[in-house]
Amino acid sequence: AKNNRDWLESEAYQNRQIPLDYQLGAGQLNAFRAYQQFSSGQHPPTASVPPVGWDYQTIDTSGEYQDYLLDRPLVENSWVSTTLVWDRLVELRDTNQNNEYDVGEAFRDRGLNRLELYLMHVEDNQIDRNVWASTSNVDSIQHIFYQVRDPGKYKIRVYSRQAVNA
């Protein structure tokens, strides 16, 4: 890391609008941990979710949200690491309709939906009562890395602040 700083000293750790550190990103890649995460399977928000997993849902409307209730309480001084990523919609202006890019054709940027990520106590429903959040308005990634101070039941909320395309 630049200047021998670690993630806990980065602007991203301290600022809710900066999801990744400029030098460190989200930190060191642990390939085995990534394997474990994907091996645990997809867990939609229809039931409580385990501490390790992933989901591939969509949110199409501004103001819509998905809550992921963690299936066990978080203990004091434990760490929460959660990441939300999504794609910007770009369409090919396919003038000859062959469904392939040809020289001279262009792309149309449909804009970037603004999604936000919140760590909340399970009983709270207002996002302004969050414990921590990642709320960048210019990135297609949100990331929370947070040390739990108050043990208890938590949920992760994915919130659509602004949907510019669906």
Label each PLM-derived region with a short phrase.
Residues 1-6:
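Short, well-structured alpha-helical segments that form the helix of a local strand-helix-strand
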Residues 9, 19-113:
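Secreted peptidase-domain scaffold signal
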